[in-house]
């Protein structure tokens, strides 16, 4: 039987570890990377010292401060994190072309061909983690198994800096003991539904038929059925076609001031234009998202006949989307823009990349908001 060798490598507290690496005075202190506690920010990540206080990613910075008042808060340095991530991904590709990044700090590696017949994936994972430490001075954990499902779960077992292996002959016993909340795709709601059926572990899950699970959980039920039996045929995909990209920002203070709204939209357009350029992509549909101070949310979408790629094109679409939005009646809390119907350059007609000057880029929004531009 053909058996794959899959490694899942996950950096340990990636953002926080970079900050502690670069600033030795932050080591062994409860460090939180993200928003500041007096604002509306959230925790992007935190070091293991901070996790002992119950702090975790996506928690509000204010809540994190209450749990640990002496924690050190630092703002993210995303440009640096992306640079380090590229360095780590390059290390992975020294061993295999089959690398599937899941985020800046984790990836799947299919090392089946590299190891050929008798090579040890566990020893290789140890070698890769050691090389990451040597070149970046950062710690990584790894999970090794014959499919993605088990490799990803295994990588979390001995954090930080550990390596866990689930060989085929031990998979069933491993899954039997596995808490249902550890299964891929099982969030709080699904976990609650499963527990109401008496499903607490992988062993419990395996007692149910595929048809039953699909009736209760839709298409995900089929995935749960096979995972409970240690089966996951998903390949490691080096290039994933993203269906959309988006950027949004939560304002420090609610506002309906035209100048602030304009500046935020221009910034979001620039970020998305850069993302399209970096990914060699074009977009054809733009969606604007507005969340007001009362948490009501409005979205407006526009599809163009020809794909676009530059910030000026994005900005010129916005006035028609803003026309039907209530921008003055109540303050705005959040603004976001997303792009969809993405195609890669070469598979679609490419627009002519004109060097649009900055004044043209902002004129369309200025006219919409009736803002009088300052004379030079």
Curated annotation (Swiss-Prot):
One GO cellular component term: cytosol
Enzyme class, first EC level, given as a word: transferase
Active site: 106
One GO term (biological process): DNA-templated DNA replication
Subcellular location: Cytoplasm
GO molecular function: damaged DNA binding; DNA-directed DNA polymerase activity; magnesium ion binding
Domain UmuC: 6-187
Cofactor binding, per record: Binds 2 magnesium ions per subunit.
Keywords assigned: Cytoplasm, DNA damage, DNA repair, DNA replication, DNA-binding, DNA-directed DNA polymerase, Magnesium, Metal-binding, Mutator protein, Nucleotidyltransferase, Transferase
Positions of the record's site feature: Substrate discrimination: 15
Positions with a binding annotation for Mg(2+): 10, 105
Cofactor(s) listed: Mg(2+)
EC identifiers of the protein: 2.7.7.7
Gene3D superfamilies: 3.30.70.270, 3.40.1170.60, 5' to 3' exonuclease, C-terminal subdomain, DNA polymerase, Y-family, little finger domain
Main location: cytoplasm
InterPro entries (alphabetical): DNA/RNA_pol_sf, DNA_pol_Y-fam_lit_finger_sf, DNA_pol_Y-fam_little_finger, DNA_polymerase-Y, DNApol_IV, IMS_HHH_1, Rev_trsase/Diguanyl_cyclase, UmuC
Superkingdom classification of source: Bacteria
Reaction it catalyzes: DNA(n) + a 2'-deoxyribonucleoside 5'-triphosphate = DNA(n+1) + diphosphate
Stored NCBIfam families: PRK02406.1 (NF002677)
Family per record: Belongs to the DNA polymerase type-Y family.
Task of the protein: Poorly processive, error-prone DNA polymerase involved in untargeted mutagenesis. Copies undamaged DNA at stalled replication forks, which arise in vivo from mismatched or misaligned primer ends. These misaligned primers can be extended by PolIV. Exhibits no 3'-5' exonuclease (proofreading) activity. May be involved in translesional synthesis, in conjunction with the beta clamp from PolIII.
Subunit structure as annotated in this protein's UniProt entry: Monomer.
Protein name: DNA polymerase IV
Organism: Desulfotalea psychrophila (strain LSv54 / DSM 12343)
């Amino acid at each position: 039987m053909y058996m794959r060798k899959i490694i899942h490598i996950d950096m340990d507290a990636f953002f926080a570890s970079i900050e502690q690496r670069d600033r030795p005075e932050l080591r062994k202190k409860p460090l939180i990377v993200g928003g500041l506690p007096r604002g509306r920010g959230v925790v992007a990540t935190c070091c293991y010292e901070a996790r002992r206080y119950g702090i975790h990613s996506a928690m509000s910075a204010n809540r994190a401060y209450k749990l640990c008042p002496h924690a050190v808060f630092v703002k993210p340095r995303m440009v640096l994190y992306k640079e380090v991530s590229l360095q780590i991904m390059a290390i992975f590709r020294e061993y295999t072309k089959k690398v599937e990044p899941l985020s800046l700090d984790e990836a799947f590696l299919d090392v089946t061909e590299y190891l050929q017949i008798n090579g040890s994936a566990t020893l290789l994972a140890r070698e890769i983690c050691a090389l990451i430490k040597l070149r970046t001075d950062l710690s990584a954990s790894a999970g090794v198994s014959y499919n993605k499902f088990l490799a990803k779960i295994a990588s979390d077992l001995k954090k930080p800096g550990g390596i866990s292996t689930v060989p085929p002959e031990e998979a069933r016993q491993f899954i039997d003991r596995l808490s249902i909340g550890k299964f891929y795709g099982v969030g709080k709601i699904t976990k609650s539904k499963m527990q109401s059926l008496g499903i607490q572990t992988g062993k419990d899950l395996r007692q149910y038929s595929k048809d039953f699970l699909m009736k209760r959980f839709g298409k995900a039920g089929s995935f749960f059925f096979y995972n409970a039996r240690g089966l996951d045929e998903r390949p490691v995909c080096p290039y994933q076609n993203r269906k959309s990209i988006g950027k949004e920002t939560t304002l420090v203070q609610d506002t309906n001031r035209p100048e602030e709204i304009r500046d935020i939209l221009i910034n979001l357009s620039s970020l998305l234009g850069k993302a399209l350029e970096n990914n060699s992509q074009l977009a054809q549909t733009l969606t604007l998202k507005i969340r007001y101070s009362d948490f009501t949310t409005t979205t407006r979408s526009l599809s163009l006949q020809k794909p676009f790629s530059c910030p000026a094109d994005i900005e010129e679409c916005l006035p028609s989307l803003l026309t039907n939005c209530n921008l003055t009646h109540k303050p705005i809390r959040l603004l976001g823009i997303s792009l969809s119907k993405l195609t890669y350059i070469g598979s679609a007609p490419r627009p002519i990349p004109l060097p649009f000057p900055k004044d043209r880029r902002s004129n369309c929004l200025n006219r919409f908001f009736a803002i009088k531009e300052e004379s030079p």
